[in-house]
Amino acid sequence: IRLAQLNNNKNNEWVLEKFFAHTIEGLPENASVLEHPDKIGDELKIALQKSKIETTNAAIAIPVTSAIIRVVTAPLMTDEELGKAIDTDSLWENLVQLTDNLNDYSIFHQVINRDKERNTMDILFVASKLSDINGYTSIIKKGGLNAVIIDVKCFALKSAVDQMNQIKGSIEESNLTAVLEFGLDENYVMILYENNPIITDIFIRSQDRNTLLKSDNQEEMEGLVRRYMTQVKQAIQDFETKYEKRIRNLKVVSNLPNVDSYLGSFRKNLANTGFNLFDPISEVKVPAQLSEGLKLANRSYLSTVIGLAF
């Protein structure tokens, strides 16, 4: 469990007021949060007491695996026409073939591109299972918090990246930033282009997870990297072809202890492209009492909680 509280000071600088990480013990390996609501709720209560965070309003992130995220192409429409098509439920049924009932999902959409020449438009479609959302909010409530914002994890990451770009004043990166989440649970490329997120899932097999977790077998690691990079390369090429923009660097977010050894392999597989760990607090003021605990070689996995706190 990670808790963070950020505030703006008089100089309009972001300050990390509170930060606390709490390790949960006694759960089986590969256990999910929703399978152990009482245990997680109790642990959250303990974490809150130790963190000394006083506000009860919280922003929480649900895993990308709990959501369906797709960029779909539709005939060109005005916002009014799009609204009518959504109201009748016909649009999503035609564009997104879901096996479940649409009423079981909370749906968010955003038009990310209109192409008048081809008479088409690209829409970001995000559907989160209501049962999962209710499960997470009840755990948060049990822990003593009120979930006022519920975001899919990748959008919390987007918030962290956007803020870092804004603080740095990097106009180029504000217009185009590519992010790669790489780990045991979440794997996707997210390209932020003119503030629109274009997300592509990266598939890894169950045996690949074992390789990431335990393996020191060079052959297995190289095979995993090849398969992984083929998908990353494809996602980048698809974007570059469509938008005629070049991606030179990817900010990497990962919770893997040995992520550095993989980054070296990524660079060899995708020459002329940089892979660097993202630091979500590089431009944030960190008080002395917190700085020691945050001197980490890899701070990228703090991106979600920091992005939520902004």
Regions found by a protein language model. Give the residues of each.
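A polyampholytic, Gly/Pro-enriched intrinsically disordered region
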Residues: L102, K168-L176, M221-L224, E292-G307
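N-terminal phosphate-binding loop and adjacent alpha-helix
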Residues: K18-Q49, R209-R227, V232-I236, G293
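Small-residue (GG/TT-enriched) beta-loop-alpha framework at ligand/catalytic clefts
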Residues: I1-F19, E54, I60, R114-V232
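Active-site neighborhood for divalent-cation/phosphate handling
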Residues: N57, A61-N165, D279-V286, Y301
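Early-domain small/polar-rich strand-loop-helix modules and first-structured segments
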Residues: I1-I68, I150, F278
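Phosphate/pyrophosphate-binding loops at sites that engage ATP/ADP/AMP, CoA/4′-phosphopantetheine
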Residues: L44-N57, K233-N249
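A short, acidic, amphipathic alpha-helical segment used as a generic capping/interface helix at domain edges
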Residues: Y228-T241, P257-S261
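Conserved phosphate-binding/catalytic loops in two-lobed NTP-binding clefts
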Residues: G264-S303
